[in-house]
């Protein structure tokens, strides 16, 4: 008997919604990244995108442990000389809370075209409302 290998056209993708309020950032990100890859499915194939769509709500209420709210720094560069920008967790959570979760999950996905396709299936929103009710996402407890 041969080993089963999933085909891209035969993959069934479900929609899930995850509430991030009160959840620890890293623990939430590892579970979401694993589901985006499809590692929870029996037909997981490393070279095929078998993951599900994940909608994360309440991104502004995600938690970190210890003093990371003031000590954890996020860096980006504008591309111009002297253009290194930095912000700590608390500042970024007030301005762009979606970016915190997206950056944490993106770092856990493969760094290739397949990883970018997986990342496109992630939808992050700061509040409780999201525009994906037509897809009837199932509640996912983490």
From Swiss-Prot:
The keyword Nucleotide-binding does not apply. Keywords: Ribonucleoprotein, Ribosomal protein. InterPro entries: Ribosomal_uL13 (IPR005822), Ribosomal_uL13_bac-type (IPR005823), Ribosomal_uL13_CS (IPR023563), Ribosomal_uL13_sf (IPR036899). One of its GO terms (cellular component) is cytosolic large ribosomal subunit. One of its GO terms (molecular function) is structural constituent of ribosome. Pfam families: Ribosomal_L13. It comes from the Bacteria. One of its GO terms (biological process) is negative regulation of translation. Belongs to the universal ribosomal protein uL13 family. Part of the 50S ribosomal subunit. This protein is one of the early assembly proteins of the 50S ribosomal subunit, although it is not seen to bind rRNA by itself. It is important during the early stages of 50S assembly. This is Large ribosomal subunit protein uL13. The lineage of its organism: Bacteria, Pseudomonadati, Pseudomonadota, Gammaproteobacteria, Oceanospirillales.
């Amino acid at each position: 008997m041969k080993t089963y290998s999933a085909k891209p056209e035969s993959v069934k993708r479900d929609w899930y919604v995850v509430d991030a309020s009160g959840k620890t950032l890293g623990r939430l990100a590892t579970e979401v990244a694993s589901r985006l890859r499809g590692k929870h499915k029996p037909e997981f194939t490393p070279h095929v995108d078998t993951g599900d769509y994940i909608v994360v709500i309440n991104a502004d209420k995600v938690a970190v442990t210890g003093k990371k709210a003031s000590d954890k720094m996020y860096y980006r560069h504008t591309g111009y000389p002297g253009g290194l920008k930095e912000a700590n967790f608390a500042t970024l959570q007030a301005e762009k809370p979606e970016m915190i979760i997206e950056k944490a999950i993106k770092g856990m996905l493969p760094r290739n075209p397949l990883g970018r396709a997986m990342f496109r299936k992630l939808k992050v929103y700061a509040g409780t409302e999201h525009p994906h009710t037509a897809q009837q996402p199932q509640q996912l407890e983490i």
